[in-house]
């Protein structure tokens, strides 16, 4: 079975081709991605209308490129998958519209996919895919969650952010320091030259006893420190960046280790854009190695939003019998779509 996946939830247009054979793990045949970062930099953030228009310009050329790279024709596609939500409404509608139009033109079914499930299952595209069950740290610009994952569609929420996500903490703190958009990668790069112990910043909910997160207070503390530094901010910017990153990473690390201890599982999956952060990876790898825990990540270029994860999630759902592709082309999107709606709380846990 050949699946085309289309991602257009925010500021990346992604298209990919995944192939399945029976119950074997789906294989990525080709993918293409266009980032809108350069376009949005002038505005200091994503402009939804511009994002939608750019998706319209990019999605069909990317589809043609993906098919050419794989040496396949559109007629060979069996299912067209697309990001149904969550995300920017206009951006989602572009991908959904193109997917449904392609499906109707080819006489092939379509399947809407949850964006976060795409991230969650993206490590299965790596050379070292995980095995169920595992603890998942889903950490991105808009979401921070810890889950127990016993199989496709068998998710138990262990904890989540009660305010800002970790990615927001990176991006908003970077903006307070005057760093360019997107702030997270710039802050991480600057932090390499700084002292992570230079400023004492809060680690919200670090000792709360549960697995929830909170990063709004950290953002406020960074703002307070930046104002306090005043004209000295530029000279101390690397130290402030390093201290901010250290606070975020410590919380993610300690909560992840607590989740592993609580579940007794020995596998951790880290997915989402923040999963590309080098400091987070290094500290998780070191701490988990001491505990005999295997850590799995997506390939670095697949940490960001991409079509491969959408095609993969669709393929794995179809293989698991949890979804049926539809030839009903009257689509709808879900800009707000809680991951909890996919969680089968009644499913019995799988032994580690």
UniProtKB/Swiss-Prot annotation:
Recorded GO terms, molecular function? iron ion binding; N(6)-L-threonylcarbamoyladenine synthase activity
CDD domains listed in its UniProt record = ASKHA_NBD_TsaD_bac
Q: What are the protein's UniProt keywords?
A: Acyltransferase, Cytoplasm, Iron, Metal-binding, Transferase, tRNA processing
Q: Name one Pfam family in it.
A: TsaD
Q: Which reaction does it catalyse?
A: L-threonylcarbamoyladenylate + adenosine(37) in tRNA = N(6)-L-threonylcarbamoyladenosine(37) in tRNA + AMP + H(+)
Q: What class of enzyme is it?
A: transferase
Look up the record and name the cofactor or cofactors this protein needs. Answer: Fe(2+)
Q: Name one GO cellular component term.
A: cytoplasm
Q: Which GO terms describe its biological process?
A: tRNA threonylcarbamoyladenosine modification
Question: Looking at the keywords, is Cytoplasm present?
Answer: yes
Could you say which EC number(s) this protein's record lists?
2.3.1.234
Enumerate the residues binding substrate: 138-142, 171, 184, 277
- Binding residues for Fe cation, per the UniProt record? 115, 119, 305
Query: How many and how are cofactors bound here?
Result: Binds 1 Fe(2+) ion per subunit.
What does the UniProt entry say about where the protein is found? Cytoplasm
Q: Which family does it belong to?
A: Belongs to the KAE1 / TsaD family.
Q: Note the NCBIfam families from the entry.
A: gcp_kae1, T6A_TsaD_YgjD
Q: What does this protein do?
A: Required for the formation of a threonylcarbamoyl group on adenosine at position 37 (t(6)A37) in tRNAs that read codons beginning with adenine. Is involved in the transfer of the threonylcarbamoyl moiety of threonylcarbamoyl-AMP (TC-AMP) to the N6 group of A37, together with TsaE and TsaB. TsaD likely plays a direct catalytic role in this reaction.
Protein name in UniProt: tRNA N6-adenosine threonylcarbamoyltransferase
